Amino acid sequence: VDTDAVLDLLRQTAIDVITPRFRALAEGEVFTKTHPGDLVTVADRESEEVITTALRRAYPDAMILGEEAASADPSLMRAFAAAEHSFTIDPIDGTYNFVHGKADHAVMVAELRSGEVVRSWIWQPEHQLAFVAEKGAGAYRNGERLPVLEPAADSTAWRGISSQAQIRDGSFEGLSPMTETWFCAGVDYSHLAAGDVDVIVFAHAKPWDHAPGMLLISEVGGVLQAGDGSTYNPAAPRPWLVGAASPTVAEGVRARMAGALVA
């Protein structure tokens, strides 16, 4: 299936399943998973089902890892780690935003071969923004190729964001204070790939949240590293991630935050 066809699948799923429920969720259509802020809706579940069915039809031998399926069956993570060919699906990234009527949500898919992300798609239905990347072929926003990022040399000029209050409230020598993310990895990574921010610090590392953005930023010169400096591995995710506009930015941030980026 060509890259445009997968993007069309995400767009159509949003039209059919996601957007009709935006700011229109009925009572009984929102559920709590692990804690009060960890939400899932009927739109998440139906969206994942539609995308999973389509990908399985196109790629019958591929392992499909959807967020909601993995939540229901944790053994799927082991199958994903062992798979030669796989896809991740985040049916609504930023569900909390979606439930609360905020436009910053996305539907995301990544394709992996032998554990390496080779294609990724991020569709933001309310913003009508598509971010697509292919390994070695660049990253694109609504069909236009994004330029290689050129972050400032001065670390105090790096624009950083984090979803974690302890990082935003922390004082790190040589770094300016970080501000809030958009609380949607698909939107966060898109802003990094577009050069709007230089670094993102995440606490959680689920593959469906980070595999799409990892390829997107790497195709414009960025990197996604674990807190210990190793390259992010979707099959064996560790807590704390630093997504940065360049290896230099990632290394600089990790060095200055070393004590904070521990599990």
Predicted feature residues:
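N-terminal subdomain of lithium-sensitive/metallo-dependent phosphomonoesterases centered on the IMPase/IPPase/PAP
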Residues: 1-92
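Residue-level signal for inorganic ion chemistry
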Residues: 18-21, 44, 55, 95, ...
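Generic detector of well-ordered alpha-helical packing
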Residues: 45, 68, 91-94, 125, ...
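Short loop segments at secondary-structure junctions
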Residues: 58, 112-116, 126, 135-138, ...
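DPxDG-like acidic metal-binding loop motif
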Residues: 80-140
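Short, isolated positions in well-ordered beta-strands
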Residues: 118, 146-148, 232
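An extended, acidic
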Residues: 150-263
